[in-house]
Design a protein with these regions (language model features):
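C-terminal helix-cap and adjacent tail motif
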Residues: 34-44, 48, 55, 62, ...
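Small-aliphatic-rich amphipathic alpha-helix that forms the alpha element of a beta-alpha
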Residues: 79-84, 147, 156-206
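Glycine/small-residue-rich phosphate/adenosyl-binding loop
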Residues: 93-174
Length: 277
């Protein structure tokens, strides 16, 4: 009765992408989705775009502000999924994610850190050494979850598309996973602290990591009391952020824009908008 002329109706559009979990999010940004094999190519609306930059500019390496608040499983799952969707050379996805909740395991890891940190302290001199001694460089026991992200350099065999001439690309890919997780965590109000002062072989032994697996990042994750307005090392006087224009070269190494830099006005506008550039 609803189709008296017995005409064939056009089939409803069905999203069939394996990444269909993205669709509800993008639908909220762009409106109705009308394709099953592509995502919109236009820029995000201003609010969504600004949220991405807000996560980037307000991301911090957290050491001292962790709260004893549990990260819900659904939030943790989103962070891991964001990490898993990092770009990777040859799509080899070389990462694994080792979650550490055990207080005993954390204590063993902190012991390794303290040993290495004292070794590191002796490598600095005079005022630098004194300042280093005052810095808190880990939140291993303070953070509810520790996470070791690793790289399996043999995951897809010895010959990897895109790694034939730059053998370190799988390591860099894993670092992209770290950054994805870090930015997603900031959007969720979760702090991340990267602890890198270990002897890698000792860390591997403590966590039972196989010989062929490379630990890339040991991260402390948790809700925080606050995010600092500037990086902690900058606030402590360790180093300052470098001017962007000193780091951008044109056409050949070392060639800055100088007085006629086409991006000069852009740098100034960025400083006014974000406080620094």
């Amino acid at each position: 009765l609803n189709n008296p002329d017995n005409k064939k109706e056009a089939p409803a559009t069905v999203i069939t992408t394996p990444y269909s979990f993205i669709i509800p999010c993008l639908t909220g940004i762009y409106g109705a989705m009308t394709t099953s094999d592509a995502l919109p190519s236009q820029p995000f609306p201003d609010a969504a775009r600004d949220a991405v930059y807000q996560a980037i500019f307000s991301r911090r390496d957290v050491r001292s502000q962790f709260l004893p608040k549990t990260i819900p499983d659904d939030v943790l799952g989103r962070l891991l999924l964001a990490a898993h969707h990092a770009p990777s050379v040859g799509f080899m996805q070389p990462w694994n994610f080792l979650l550490i909740r055990s207080v005993e395991t954390k204590a063993r890891i902190q012991t390794l850190f303290r040993k290495a940190n004292e070794e590191a302290r002796t490598q600095f001199k005079d005022e630098r050494k004194d300042l280093y001694s005052r810095l808190k460089l880990e939140g291993i026991l303070d953070a509810p979850i520790n996470l070791c992200i690793t790289c399996d350099r043999e995951r897809t065999g010895q010959t990897v598309l895109g790694r034939t001439h730059m053998k370190e690309m799988d390591l860099y890919s894993t670092v992209c996973a770290v950054q994805n997780l870090w930015l997603a965590a900031r959007a969720e109000g979760i702090g991340v602290g990267w602890v890198s002062i270990f002897h890698p072989h000792e860390l591997k032994a403590a966590l039972g990591i196989p010989e062929n697996i490379v630990p890339i990042a040991y991260l402390c994750l948790g809700y925080v009391s606050e995010f600092l307005d500037r990086p902690e090392l900058e606030k402590a006087g360790w180093l300052s952020r470098l001017p962007l224009e000193d780091l951008v070269f044109h056409d050949t190494w070392g060639q800055t824009g100088g007085e006629h830099d086409p991006l000069a006005d852009t740098y100034q506008a960025l400083r006014q908008q974000y406080g620094y550039a």
